[in-house]
Amino acid sequence: MAKKTVFITGATGNMGWAGFQELYARRERFDIRILARDSKKNRRKLKPYLADPSVTVIWGDLMRYEDVLSGVTGADYVLHVGGMVSPAADYYPEKTLKVNVGSAENVVKAIQAQPDSSKIKVVYIGSVAQYGDRNPPHHWGDADDPQTPALFDMYALSKIRSEEIFASAGLKHWVSLRQSGILYPGILSVVNPTAFHVPMGGVLEWATIEDSGRLLAQVCEDWVPEDFWNKAYNISSGGQYRMTNYEFMNRMLSALGLPSPEKVFEPQWFALKNFHGMWYKDADILDEILHFRANVPVDEHFATMKSKLPWFYHLAFLAPAWAVKMFMKPFAFEKGMGTQWWVKNDPEKFEAYYGSREAYEAIRSWDDVRPAPLEKFLKQL
């Protein structure tokens, strides 16, 4: 049987790299073509694979149509994972819109330029951000829900527009897989002001990096049914990965041996609304088709993530709570991006993320933002 050719964008990013690794493990059946920016970091990362005949690296740019066309030409599958994501997307919103929408246009144009585009199956990676603010009691939803991005969220808008480009292009085989938050080792060490844009009372249904990579490989298998295509699906690692944002913060700090959120953050630092995240009524549909979940227990996965961090992160438990708090405080007050900077300097964002001055001033303790327990498995849904 002839090998299939898979073209993947964003292969040096978190999800893309996990997908590449899964495909590479199946290289007896797949030739893998990668479009990557020509940088020292990417050269170093891809060096071990450059001599492998099953891997072709195109050094280029998603915004250059000719580079995208080189990747698409002759491909059986196109996995469009690349684009700008947070935190870069938060700092450069206009560029994010331009790059994410422009790259989607280039991919579709390149597919349509093929002699028989109907033979190409294209996978677009969307985002849970497309649904916008879904705080309780409106925290359950599915892929048919309206897409209402949060205010100021150009990333979410770019994902909505890009998905529409694929859906309306007349392609015979397209699918949008809307990614949630990805649990990968580096997330335990990511520190930036956007952490405080996340309401503690909000929710998210997470996906592990391993499941996400396996998903990208599974979708390229011959046994995927025809009726899978031309739809949108939500990605998650299942009901056990449903967490409130407060619960996630607790798990993350605990994994590093750090004190609870109450001891290292002020409750006012966290926004009250205008983010994204929900729990899925249709969470299992995608796995029932593609069988990508490993069903690793949540606590075990957090322990695995910690084990993959550099050694010095394992010493985090030595830091006293007051020192951690002093380290984190500047991010809440960072000019332009910090929630506490908005309080005095950006009334539009302040209102969008807190609702009102009264709502902000009503936050007097963690009891005012700590969410009540939520039922994670609702049979009636």
Residue ranges and their predicted role:
Residues M63, Y91, K95-N106, P149, ...:
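Glycine-rich NAD(P)-binding loop of the Rossmann-fold in SDR/ketoreductase-type enzymes
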Residues M84, G102-F152, V175:
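Conserved Rossmann-fold NAD(P)-dependent oxidoreductase catalytic core, especially the SDR/UDP-sugar
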Residues L157, V198-W223, K231:
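Substrate-positioning beta->alpha
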